[in-house]
C-alpha cells in the first residue's frame, strides 16, 4: 500500500475540527477509562503507527499494522521519530514528534548523510518538530515547527523527542524536549506552546542538569503523581545508555538526581514512557531497547517509584503484540470505551472494549 494514500482522508496540513466535538470534549474520569492506545514508529518507514489494547498487556496495531500517517507526508525531512501522545485539560489529544529521517539519504530524500554539515551540527541534526492536535484521534491539525527559526540566536543543532504535558500553574501545554546547541552535549529543555498547539511561545529553559556535565542526557518523560509531585524518567549516556529517574515538587524544574538506573537491561536503552494501569495504583515504565536485534520494548512496573518489577520485553513475558514487531520510541495513554470503539471502527479493527 502506498503510504501517501494512507494519509489522504485522514489528515491534511490543517483540518478544521468540528465545533460541536471540541465544545463537548472533556477529560474523562478514571472510572470511565477502558482501553489503551500505543503510538510508535519504526525505522523502515519513519512513520506513525497506532495500536490498541483492551487490558494493557496485549496490543494490536490498527490499519493491518501499516502506518496510520506517512512520515513523508507530514515532516519536512520526510520522516518522523519519537511520537508522544497525551491528553490535555480541554479533552484534546496532543501528539508531538521529531521531524527527522535518520536514513534520508538511503531513502533518496537528500544527497547528504544529514540535513546540515555533520561536523558542525553533529549526528542526527534536524530543525524541529511535528505538532498535532485532535479531539477524536481521527481528524488532526498539524504544524511543522522549526526551532531554529523561532530561536535563531541559539544555534540549534538538533531538537529531538518532544513530549507534552499540561502545566496547571502556567495554564499552558508545556513542550519539553532534547536539544543540542552547536556541537555540544544534548540537554533537556522546556517551553510553552500556544493554545492551538502550532508553535512555541516562550524561550527554552533547562529542565534538569545531570551532575556530570560531560554526560549527555535526553528523552525526558514526566509523570504527575497523586501526591502532587512529579517524576521524570530520562536517558543518561553514562556507560551504556540507561534509564534514570529524578523527582520534583514542580513540573518545570527542581528535579533531584537519583543515581540508580531503573531499567533491567544489560545493553543500552532509551525513550522511557510511564503510563498508569486503569483502575489500579500501578504504573508501567516502557522503554526502547535499541541495543538488541531486532529492536523491542522493555517494561517494568511500580506502585511507589521506589521498587520496580521487571515485566520483560514484548512477547518475552506478560506484555504481548499480536500483529507487529520492532516498534521504536513509543508512548501509551488510556482511552474510554467510546474513544477506543470509534478508533477501532475507523480503521476496520474488529476489537471490542
List each language-model region with its residue ranges.
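Bacterial N-terminal signal peptides that target proteins for export
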Residues: 1-10
Amino acid at each position: 500500500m502506498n503510504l501517501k494514500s494512507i494519509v489522504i482522508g485522514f489528515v491534511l496540513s490543517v483540518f478544521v475540527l468540528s465545533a460541536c466535538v471540541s465544545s463537548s470534549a472533556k477529560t474523562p474520569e478514571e472510572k470511565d477509562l477502558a482501553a489503551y492506545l500505543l503510538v510508535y514508529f519504526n525505522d523502515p518507514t519513519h512513520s506513525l503507527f497506532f495500536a490498541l489494547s483492551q487490558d494493557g498487556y496485549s496490543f494490536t496495531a490498527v490499519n493491518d499494522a501499516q502506518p496510520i500517517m506517512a512520515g513523508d507526508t507530514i515532516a519536512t525531512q520526510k520522516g518522523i521519530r519519537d511520537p508522544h501522545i497525551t491528553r490535555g485539560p480541554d479533552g484534546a489529544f496532543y501528539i508531538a514528534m521529531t521531524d527527522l529521517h535518520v536514513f534520508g539519504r538511503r531513502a533518496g530524500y537528500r544527497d547528504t548523510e544529514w540535513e546540515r554539515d555533520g561536523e558542525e551540527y553533529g549526528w542526527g541534526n534536524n530543525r524541529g518538530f511535528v505538532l498535532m492536535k485532535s479531539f477524536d484521534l481521527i481528524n488532526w491539525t498539524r504544524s511543522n515547527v522549526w526551532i531554529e527559526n523561532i530561536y535563531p540566536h541559539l544555534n540549534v543543532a538538533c531538537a529531538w523527542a518532544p513530549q507534552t504535558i499540561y502545566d496547571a500553574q502556567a495554564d499552558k501545554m508545556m513542550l519539553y524536549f532534547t536539544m543540542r546547541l552547536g556541537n555540544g552535549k544534548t540537554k533537556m529543555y522546556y517551553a510553552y506552546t500556544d493554545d492551538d498547539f502550532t508553535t512555541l511561545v516562550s524561550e527554552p529553559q533547562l529542565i534538569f542538569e545531570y551532575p556530570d556535565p560531560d554526560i549527555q542526557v535526553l528523552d525526558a518523560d514526566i509523570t504527575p503523581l497523586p501526591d502532587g509531585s512529579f517524576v521524570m524518567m530520562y536517558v543518561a549516556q553514562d556507560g551504556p545508555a540507561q534509564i534514570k529517574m529524578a523527582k520534583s515538587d514542580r513540573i518545570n524544574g527542581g528535579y533531584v538526581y537519583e543515581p540508580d538506573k531503573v531499567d533491567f537491561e544489560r545493553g543500552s536503552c532509551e525513550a522511557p514512557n510511564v503510563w498508569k494501569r486503569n483502575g489500579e495504583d500501578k504504573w508501567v515504565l516502557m522503554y526502547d531497547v535499541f541495543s538488541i536485534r531486532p529492536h523491542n520494548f522493555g517494561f517494568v512496573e511500580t506502585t511507589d517509584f521506589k521498587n520496580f518489577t521487571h515485566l520483560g520485553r514484548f512477547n518475552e513475558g506478560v506484555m504481548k503484540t499480536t500483529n507487529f514487531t520492532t516498534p521504536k520510541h513509543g508512548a501509551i495513554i488510556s482511552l474510554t470505551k467510546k474513544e477506543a470503539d470509534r478508533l477501532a471502527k475507523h480503521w476496520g479493527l474488529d476489537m471490542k472494549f
